[in-house]
Amino acid sequence: MPNLKSTPHLQATFLLLIAMLSLQSSGSLAKVLFDQFPILTVSAMRLLLGSIILAVLFKIWQVDFKQVKYKAILSYGFALAGMNLLFYLSIARLPLGIAVSFEFIGPLSVALFYAKQRFDFVWVGLAILGLVLLFPFDQAAQPLDPLGIAFALGAGACWALYIVAGQRPSGVSGNHTVCLGMFVGMLILMPLAVFSGLPTNVF
């Protein structure tokens, strides 16, 4: 019989693995799209399609918008928009593995800041060791674009803000928080994408 106390941790680990797989695979797909569409267009359309899918999946129309804490949603959406855009800008200038390694400094910093128990530091150390083992040193031997590194670090900072903002009470469920935050992120990026010629590049 499974240990009921461990079930949520197993589920969280499983969902985390899926999330990381989706993140990295979407980065690879995005690099292909950069040949046909501006980076702003790709980032904005990703958030647009994501917000529509989540709105239908989690029935966003059932949300009591009077209960929504909009400051929390705005900070979450801003972090999400910055994380997506800056990450895409970084992988346009850097190899994917190197960009991800720099970006991971953000969430690792959050984990280190909130670490309280001995095992918390052990897990952070193992994560850093994993990054070192997976780091593409052969690609790093070539000159790296400083602006690409800056974009990756900026994406990591937004990722850290995304984690912290996601812990703040938003007045709605976690699923609806993600949906509304993604919609806010789309609203932030879409005007910039339209200004850069989204309708022409998409349609």
Predicted regions and their residues:
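Loop-to-transmembrane alpha-helix entry segments
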Residues: 67-69, 98-103, 113-134, 142-149
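Membrane-interface helix caps and helix-loop-helix hairpins in membrane proteins
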Residues: 88-93, 116-117, 137-146, 168, ...
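Hydrophobic transmembrane alpha-helices of multi-pass small-molecule transport proteins
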Residues: 54, 105, 119-138, 155, ...
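Specific transmembrane alpha-helical segments of multi-pass solute transporters/efflux pumps
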Residues: 58-99, 131-133, 202-203
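Glycine-/small-residue-enriched transmembrane alpha-helix faces in small-molecule transporters
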Residues: 1-41, 75-78, 82-86, 129, ...
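A helix-boundary/kink motif common to multi-pass secondary transporters
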Residues: 38-39, 95, 173-174
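Specific alpha-helical transmembrane segments that line the substrate/conduction pathway
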Residues: 41, 48, 88-118, 155
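Membrane-interface helix-boundary motifs at transmembrane edges
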Residues: 62-69, 109-119, 164-176
